[in-house]
Amino acid sequence: MVLSAADKTNVKGVFSKIGGHAEEYGAETLERMFTAYPQTKTYFPHFDLQHGSAQIKAHGKKVAAALVEAVNHIDDIAGALSKLSDLHAQKLRVDPVNFKFLGHCFLVVVAIHHPSALTPEVHASLDKFLCAVGTVLTAKYR
């Protein structure tokens, strides 16, 4: 999916508002995903999935870091997330639909914390960006 110049500006604008909360939002996104889509828990059998667990916070930090990396390299998301794509496709074998679930939950978290920033245009841009990230992460699946 091709992001327009306006999309890129909108995505960078949202992430500038997220700022120092990215790790917190990453953990909240995971908690929402595990609640709304309980089948996603199967990839984390060794995790304490209770609210506020250290493992969810740590993985939320990784999710946030990957999204920030994608934003920082918005013109080359595939290059920025290549190793992560390999990991998810070849080692973890995560069902690709889970990236859509994660993206949806991230949109909800952004909407809760920054409702005025999530205009229809920004929402569409952020959704396109998250779809692009999901596409990159599933590109190496066979």
From Swiss-Prot:
Coiled-coil segments, which residues? none
Report the sequence similarity comment from the record.
Belongs to the globin family.
Can the keyword Transport be found in this entry's annotation?
Answer: yes
Q: What residues does the Globin domain cover?
A: 2-142
Q: Could you tell me in which tissues this protein is expressed?
A: Red blood cells.
Q: Which residues bind heme b?
A: 88
Keyword Heme carried by entry: yes
The protein's UniProt keywords, in alphabetical order, are:
Heme, Iron, Metal-binding, Oxygen transport, Transport
State its role.
Answer: Involved in oxygen transport from the lung to the various peripheral tissues.
**Subunit annotation:** Heterotetramer of two alpha chains and two beta chains.
Which cysteines share a disulfide bond?
none
Q: Which GO terms describe its biological process?
A: hydrogen peroxide catabolic process
User: Which named protein is this?
Assistant: Hemoglobin subunit alpha-A
